[in-house]
């Protein structure tokens, strides 16, 4: 739009969530640094807009929203005779990491439709990964868009095509596939889940097929092994000395497939734990609410309090 001279001066580029808050509170739109990252115009080193890049893109005539401090009240919503304080929207990725109750000695594996490998650091550490602002002035290093549920569904659709085309009764294919993968031995079958563009390429494959090593079980075991290899390689990029104490699994697929967790654990030779709750993002919002309402001094302190509260659900599972 800028190249075509279609941008009107002083327009405010704003996320949907921040627009809603601004409209409800009748206040000027603002943005949190964790959300500003999505604009791809944030200087992560200063948590301010990257003015030089904005000028180079001819976007300097726009009125950019102020980047607020963590937990800053940006408006008041009238609810009956009460005024409810409202805060800037935060990044869902960072909120989910907070809800995983991740500490700096743990490696996060979020596995759902797509997947991410992440860690939290005190300082910026550049490398072959994304660095995003986190809470309390910290940073999150991550490699995202790794093959997971979306790629596995390609294989699920393949092995269920015949019963579906014959109109046979629906069944829980995942339950059968997980059990078959668990019972399958290592067969040498190789699966590359890179069916879609991403950090691990965009040309998937099934290879090393022999007369007796191709079955539903070996196919999905090979797929899970490929995921584990991807995570291990990416973990080495964001954490070169591999000094993490344990893995934290979050996301629907990681919770659902114990066989996948076991194969990943074998690849890493590292203990693991699950996120305390299925809804990790909502738990992250609880941590933020504790910090923003001054019930705790920081988001980190709120996460520690929740770790204590949910201690019985954070049991670490060691290698067997």
Residue ranges and their predicted role:
Residues 62-64, 244:
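Core-facing hydrophobic residues within beta-strands of well-ordered domains
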